[in-house]
């Protein structure tokens, strides 16, 4: 390919102001993507080649374990999503599905994921155990109405994803295939030149019994990973479990009531009363909004030195009611409080808050759903809000069971926690970028969409399902987070748009021009993925662009061309060798093979 005719380089001299993280900055500056609108990007020719190379790696690996590629519609009828009971959750409030009505008034959604459609198809095409197992996958554009698109392709409204779905006759067969896909994912990410870690994860809106995320560790990551140094445990903070540190016991001579004027935070109470946060129970009030406009006020308690994990809390609340939970948010809006609550001592709320604080005129449930974390319920003596402005209270032998509290794990595990009583190993923390996620869905969708098969005994059974996603465009950006320097991108050769770029310093020199064409054609004949920078720009401009776009190897043709010598520069490790042109191809192939075979 030639820059002048096939691959114009749209590089920028200045860093775009809207880009917050380095990978986003470099994708824009190097001309790989162009912003069309918030969270919407055009993939320019260089970027498309990266996407195609990643897709080819994915296809090769998935095909090797028996998966079959197809293409599903992006426009989904609402009826399918209503059958799975996900329509309202994905379209109401902060739901992420773009939705519309056609000329006849029928509702549709732009696909953020495809569980409903593939299950509907499976219900029509799979009818016997003899057809199982089966796994289908596709690579296509997905749409998500992100509240705050940011970080380029990391959190965009339109992105390219590989999503796969498997169908099985038994839970054991699903579990076995789930592990096989997990191994395939590790091969895929290694083949893309990435360093990844697999972590236990929350299944979120997709659902299912268990799931695993694949993370690229990077400072720009939005997720927190907790792990042990030995590798025995790793989990997303949303899912991670641990043992909290031991609390400091309260002194015996402390007064029952503490006057705490304007001390509304845990730290303020501790600083003014010589207390430790582990001696306090923090109370947070939230509103759970369900389908059918059912609203339940939540009173959640956690030890003062811990933080509530809203994902764990959401999942726990969702299991308590017949309706699907759509949203969970803190009660802090003044109008909401005045309309629904009375005599609420904000900042001084205790675990024994009376149900009478909920107004009779409110459309909320007329009692608090009370939930407490294990770390707090174990305290025999603690301080909490006194349900009276400017006062906290000492609670002794407070029976959470008798107060209708649900006791569970609703706290964030954190760095320094131990993973179990029998293991002294402490958790460490890193930031990560999720690039893959696999789920054991069980029978959640097959049951609701009536996808059944006939077993060996002729009995109709619900299909067992798995779901497997990879963010194709996320892989590209995550690779840049792990592979860049001050000058630009340093692509892993496996997914680089080209393996080598040829840079003649002066094409007006006939010797350089002839040698450039010879080398270029020789590379093409030997099926080397080569880009020729045949612009008449200054050499400095070409070098700067080459370093910015990050192609792994550069062949620099300069004054030594008269002696049939060129320079072979490796962008990855910044090494340069002078070499005769008759040894160039052999040396390049040898050096590039080392890169291809290098483990990430």
From Swiss-Prot:
CDD domains for this protein: ProRS-INS, ProRS_anticodon_short
Q: In its UniProt record, which GO terms are filed under biological process?
A: prolyl-tRNA aminoacylation
State what protein this is by name: Proline--tRNA ligase
UniProt cross-references to InterPro entries, sorted A to Z: aa-tRNA-synt_IIb, aa-tRNA-synth_II, aa-tRNA-synth_II/BPL/LPL, Anticodon-bd, Anticodon-bd_dom_sf, Pro-tRNA-ligase_IIa, Pro-tRNA-synth_IIa_bac-type, Pro-tRNA-Synthase_IIa_type1
Q: Where in the cell is it found?
A: Cytoplasm
Q: Which UniProt keywords apply?
A: Aminoacyl-tRNA synthetase, ATP-binding, Cytoplasm, Ligase, Nucleotide-binding, Protein biosynthesis
Pfam families (UniProt xref):
HGTP_anticodon (PF03129), tRNA-synt_2b (PF00587), tRNA_edit (PF04073)
Query: Mainly resides where?
Result: cytoplasm
**Protein's organism:** Prochlorococcus marinus (strain MIT 9301)
Keyword Protein biosynthesis in annotation: yes
Q: What does this protein do?
A: Catalyzes the attachment of proline to tRNA(Pro) in a two-step reaction: proline is first activated by ATP to form Pro-AMP and then transferred to the acceptor end of tRNA(Pro). As ProRS can inadvertently accommodate and process non-cognate amino acids such as alanine and cysteine, to avoid such errors it has two additional distinct editing activities against alanine. One activity is designated as 'pretransfer' editing and involves the tRNA(Pro)-independent hydrolysis of activated Ala-AMP.
Similarity comment text for this entry: Belongs to the class-II aminoacyl-tRNA synthetase family. ProS type 1 subfamily.
